[in-house]
């Protein structure tokens, strides 16, 4: 790697892999690559810590990858482990689903803290993370390397690498620069989120999911944080029937519903303003690579179309992209390796989620599904909770290539 003018400068850098975007998918890729001796540079237009509109929930799948990457939950001040899940059916009935106790199977981690901790982990591994550096364009693409222009302090700098991993979000500037954007694309989900404090009801310690009839197949949530705070929000599918402009009214109404007020307590206080974000969830249609560029996370539209959750998919896709580069070969071979890995690990789960989403789109389907699980006994409830939080891939029963000896018997992440 060439010397630079400062630790936060990209001036004339040369590296093996440039990662555009320092979110979970980008840092996961960087950590995997660095562990095999690859020189990696990560750029991000933001300065950390920075907030990210998100529900902050971590599934078992996400926790397992974080554990494998050597991430320490203690570096996130408000990390909250959840031991069970509470679901409310459209009929109003509530059910508790216990998670296994050996290890962590669900956790809440504010993204402003989680993403910053991941960046610091990368730096502790001698990965150069350049903040305030924004991708501008692809300057040159040859048979040996790719060169991009980066903007920092109103100056254009260049970075040359063998590959670029674009972890730069749903509206990926890298994808756009390659002429691969989809005009007018607004994602498959849309979500609202806000923090609340002075929560004195049961929500201050429960992970709650409300299946509201008017939100199906979407849902509302309240995820607990320390000091009587929660992350509360809702997500809906973009089905052409809902006007996103009306979501603010839905939000106001949701916070006044008796069961929500009861869960939060009478004196809860909403913090700052609400934030909203679109969620891409069609990984089976996404182009995962072009030339010497691989797309990961939201840039690969890799979120769960059933829940809108994306941190686990982001971490997984970043790791898969890194593994494809490590395996080596010509750019077309690397792209194909990554595309096949994404297909193996994400396509079947995506299609399963689509089918389930259709069932949950109607009150009768949601009520019936929850009723069946509620009558399945402790074993059924516990394993449903593990399945819901992706302890195993959602469609693993139908994808024999992913079967393993410890299927459904894996130890929990962060098991002391």
Predicted region positions:
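Beta1/beta-strand and adjacent pyrophosphate-binding region of the FAD-binding site
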Residues: 9-25
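Conserved Rossmann-like nucleotide-cofactor binding loop
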Residues: 25, 48, 171
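Glycine-rich FAD pyrophosphate-binding loop
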Residues: 31-54
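Conserved N-terminal glycine-rich FAD pyrophosphate-binding loop of Rossmann-like flavoproteins
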Residues: 47-67
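A conserved beta-strand/loop capping segment in the N-terminal third of enzymes
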Residues: 63, 67-117
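FAD/FMN-dependent oxidoreductases across multiple families
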Residues: 78, 240-324, 330-332
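Predominantly flavin-linked oxidoreductase catalytic cores and closely associated redox partners
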Residues: 121-262
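C-terminal helical "tail/cap" subdomain of flavin- and related membrane-associated enzymes
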Residues: 323-416
């Amino acid at each position: 790697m060439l010397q630079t003018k400062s630790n936060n400068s990209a001036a004339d850098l040369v590296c093996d892999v440039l990662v555009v975007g320092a979110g979970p998918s980008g840092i996961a890729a960087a950590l995997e690559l660095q562990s095999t001796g690859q020189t990696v540079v990560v750029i991000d237009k933001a300065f950390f810590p920075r907030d990210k509109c998100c529900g902050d929930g971590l599934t078992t799948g996400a926790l397992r990858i974080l554990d494998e990457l050597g991430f320490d939950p203690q570096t996130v001040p408000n990390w909250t482990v959840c031991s069970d899940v509470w679901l409310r059916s459209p009929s109003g009935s509530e059910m508790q689903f216990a998670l296994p106790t050996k290890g962590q199977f669900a956790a809440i981690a504010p993204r402003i803290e989680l993403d910053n901790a991941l960046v610091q982990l990368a730096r502790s591994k001698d990965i150069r993370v350049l903040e305030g550096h924004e991708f501008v364009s692809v300057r040159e693409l040859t048979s040996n390397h790719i060169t991009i222009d980066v903007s920092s302090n109103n100056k254009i700098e260049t970075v040359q690498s063998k590959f670029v991993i674009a972890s730069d979000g749903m509206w990926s500037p890298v994808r756009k620069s390659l002429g691969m954007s989809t005009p007018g694309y607004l994602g498959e989900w849309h979500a609202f989120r806000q923090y609340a404090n002075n929560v004195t009801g049961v929500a201050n310690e429960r992970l709650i999911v409300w299946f509201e009839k008017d939100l199906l197949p979407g849902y509302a949530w309240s995820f607990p944080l320390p000091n009587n705070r929660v992350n509360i929000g809702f997500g809906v599918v973009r089905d052409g029937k809902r006007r996103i402009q009306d979501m603010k009214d839905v939000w106001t109404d949701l916070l006044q519903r008796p069961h929500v007020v009861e869960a939060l307590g009478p004196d809860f206080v909403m913090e700052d303003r609400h934030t909203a974000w679109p969620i891409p969830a069609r990984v089976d249609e996404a182009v995962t690579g072009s030339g010497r560029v691989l797309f990961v996370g939201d840039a690969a539209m890799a979120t769960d179309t059933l829940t809108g959750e994306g941190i686990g998919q982001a971490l997984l896709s970043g790791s898969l992209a890194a593994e494809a580069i490590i395996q080596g070969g010509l750019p077309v071979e690397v792209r194909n390796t990554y595309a096949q890995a994404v297909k193996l690990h994400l396509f079947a789960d995506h299609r399963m989620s689509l089918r389930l989403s259709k069932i949950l789109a109607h009150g009768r389907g949601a009520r019936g599904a929850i009723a069946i699980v509620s009558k399945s006994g402790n074993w059924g409830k516990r394993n449903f909770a593990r399945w819901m939080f992706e302890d195993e891939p959602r469609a693993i029963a139908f994808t024999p290539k992913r079967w393993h000896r410890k299927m459904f018997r894996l130890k929990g992440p962060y098991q002391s």
